[in-house]
Amino acid sequence: MEDERGREHGGDAAQQKTPRPECEESRPLSVEKKQRCRLDGKDTDGSKFITSNGGDFSDPVYKEIAMTNGCINRMSKEELRAKLSEFKLETRGVKDVLKKRLKNYYKKQKLMLKESNAVDSYYDYICIIDFEATCEEGNPAEFLHEIIEFPVVLLNTHSLEIEDTFQQYVRPEVNSQLSEFCIGLTGITQDQVDRADAFPQVLKKVIEWMKSKELGTKYKYCILTDGSWDMSKFLNIQCQLSRLKYPSFAKKWINIRKSYGNFYKVPRSQTKLTIMLEKLGMDYDGRPHSGLDDSKNIARIAVRMLQDGCELRINEKLHGGQLMSVSSSLPVEGAPAPQMPHSRK
């Protein structure tokens, strides 16, 4: 769900020689030098840039990467698209996204040449979850949100394909009658939730489905959400209402809004689902506030970010019932194998 209800969420490249950028300095001008940089022999206008040659980045490959980045920074949007097209990369998106995409392509190629045996740091699978919950217009503070749609989209990070999906509606028990606002927003009808199972039964089905995919046993995986509220609020409250302990597999997750903002260097205000799609050159596919459709669109953003060179990592967790950030510098870890949580006493 997004924030209309007043909340935050609502070929083997290593075998190829990477083109090395060349910079030719012209004669010095009065104060500063000017350069003409070339990517694959094609000129782009530019001015002087400075690189560091100390510390861990003293290896020549990092100097090459810095030179390449300087050239890319001075390319026009048309030049960026032409270069991306040449490498058969996605050409949609705003200029800053295109620059980031091209920079990460060159960086990845150069580092692969430097360390041909580099280990893939991604999870095998990412489970995208975007709950829909009961709601009322104005989002009153005392209202208890109950999950009414539990979708899961299984994204294979190696093939970058959606491998499978799960979806079940959930029968609310505290506020069993959906508000007209909720029906209009989510498209979920009273009849659909009346005929659905209660949350504990649906959670059991979700866990059985995840086990059938060998998540946490054969394959490393993690949860990904669009914001913090799905896990820290909706699932947390629902487990309390259903007298269940919070499931261990959902205690840590990737908040894609944080990942997107940090990777593309954009403010929090530009990390809403529809804005992220727009900035990446994509349109929303499906019905907004359908949990399954939202999850599929979030998966599309995750795929584009992985293609652009982002290492999606767990960045949030629930600890002692409190939402906390997780440092991106920590080693990549997967979620534990899913197990049905015990009942609360």
UniProtKB/Swiss-Prot annotation:
Record-annotated active site? E132 (proton acceptor), H289 (proton acceptor)
Binding residues annotated for Mg(2+) 1, in chain numbering: D130, E132, D294
Exonuclease domain segment(s): 126-302
Taken from the UniProt entry, a GO cellular component term is: nucleus
| TM region(s), chain numbering | none
Lineage: superkingdom? Eukaryota
List the SMART domains hit by this protein, alphabetically: EXOIII, SAP
In the record, biological process GO terms are: exonucleolytic trimming to generate mature 3'-end of 5.8S rRNA from tricistronic rRNA transcript (SSU-rRNA, 5.8S rRNA, LSU-rRNA); maturation of 5.8S rRNA; regulatory ncRNA-mediated gene silencing; rRNA 3'-end processing
Sites where the protein binds Mg(2+) 2: D130, D230
Q: Which GO terms describe its molecular function?
A: 3'-5' exonuclease activity; 3'-5'-RNA exonuclease activity; histone pre-mRNA stem-loop binding; metal ion binding; ribosome binding; rRNA binding
Residue span, SAP domain? 72-106
Subunit annotation: Identified in a histone pre-mRNA complex, at least composed of ERI1, LSM11, SLBP, SNRPB, SYNCRIP and YBX1. Binds to 40S and 60S ribosomal subunits and to 80S assembled ribosomes. Interacts in a cooperative manner with SLBP to the mature 3'-end of histone mRNAs. Found in a ternary complex with SLBP and the stem-loop structure of the 3'-end of histone mRNAs.
Q: What is this protein called?
A: 3'-5' exoribonuclease 1
Q: Which gene encodes it?
A: Eri1
